[in-house]
Amino acid sequence: PDVRYACGSLFRLSGIQFHALWNEKEGAAVKKYAIDLDLSKCVACGACAVACMDQNDYEVREGQRPYRNIFDMELEKNNSVSYNRLSLACMHCEDAPCITGCPSACLRKDPETNLTVYDTTNCIGCHSCAMACPYGIPSFGENGKMIKCDGCYVRVHRGLLPACVKACPFGALKLVDLEAPEKQIPKEPSLR
């Protein structure tokens, strides 16, 4: 796979698709789900970021950023440069360094989806999670406590699509099962 740099971080791209992985445990079997970003379809419209803010009832204030961010990305191939957009949120890393970095144990893996979720009740606002995150994802609200994408794990538990996937008008974001990519995941229809 190609290796690219964006937002100061290293990304592995398989063709032009980018995956944020998580596992959903079902009995003894483990399914691997992903929010798949097709870079060729993303036009940086921001619908995913707005849907995320609406889903989480989050208003971005000065000095803050949304849970999902849109970045420009330069891709160099065969001595030519192309520009793509990258819709980036928490990557829900398998061995999430933010969990290890948090001295207050505010971050954890959801046992059903393996998404990195949080409860800021004990958050001391030390920014250790943000410093540990290789993608720089955790940010901090007006109260000084950590906030980030939780993968809409409550929606996923209910059989719904994550808000960003549902709202994407160009089909750039999809919820996929990496173990059975040809099989459609029976979820609610997206807005496109």
Tell me the role of every PLM-derived stretch.
Residues 4, 23, 64-94, 99-100, ...:
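Flanking helices and flexible, charged tails adjoining ferredoxin-like Fe-S electron-transfer domains
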Residues 11-29:
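Short, Lys/Arg-enriched N-terminal segments with co-localized hydrophobic residues
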Residues 31-40, 53-69:
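N-terminal cysteine/histidine-rich coordination modules
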Residues 38-39, 104, 120:
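Aromatic-flanked redox-active Cys/Sec active sites in thiol-based oxidoreductases
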Residues 49-50, 54-55, 72-76:
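A positional/architectural concept
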Residues 92-106, 110, 115:
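Ordered, amphipathic secondary-structure segments that act as subunit-interaction surfaces
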